[in-house]
Amino acid sequence: MAPKKKGKSEGLTAASPQPAKATPNWPAFTPLVPKSDLALEEVLQGQIVTIPNFWTATLCKNYVSFLSSLPLTTTPGKPKKGDAVRVNDRFQIDDPVFAERLWSQTALKSLVTEAQRKELWGGEVVGLNPNIRIYRYSKGQFFDQHYDDSNNVTLPGAPPTLARTTWTLLLYLTSPATGCIGGETVFYPYSPRKKSKDPTPEPFVVDLEAGLALLHRHGADCMLHEGREVTDGEKWVIRSDLCVKR
């Protein structure tokens, strides 16, 4: 894995959102594609997994309409030292109920918890990070090259479950079909043989598809990646993380 000289994303603040916000009245997850019609696709071995059509176009459209009503905050123009440059609008809330709904009321839980995938995720997956983040990228906005950190979290329950995040979950709600141009997520493979004469590996590009769920490994083994500039329309994303027992 590449030495981490580029900026990081959210660090420990990702696990500690301010608790004062009122919990949104999230819309129901309807309509959904039947679980039997969905599958995990490991598009880059050990690093990137996608679930095409995880959400329907109608559900994505309903959520974009709802999320537009939330009090989004524009990120600072100058990031903290060591953080990557990011220009977007965001909403962040600690909402264990929504995280559990997204985990268990969709196909995500059944797809992710298949026994043979435990090694892939870095442990026994027990749910999603209750730290829910909503991102909107308008024309000219982007997220520069960075790595996503792993965080320790506590999932509510009796007793609570001590967990850590191992994979980022990004759920795309818009795409070129909805008028969003640009905004692709780009991953940069790293060749450990610095003196090798082999050409630098080509970047791995994940195009926007409304309803696509993208999972990518983070923490110590995170690939350098970025969100390209949006050149037209709006890019909407719901962000959480897979949590494994610690």
Language model region names:
Residues 1-213, 221-246:
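Fe(II)/2-oxoglutarate oxygenase catalytic core
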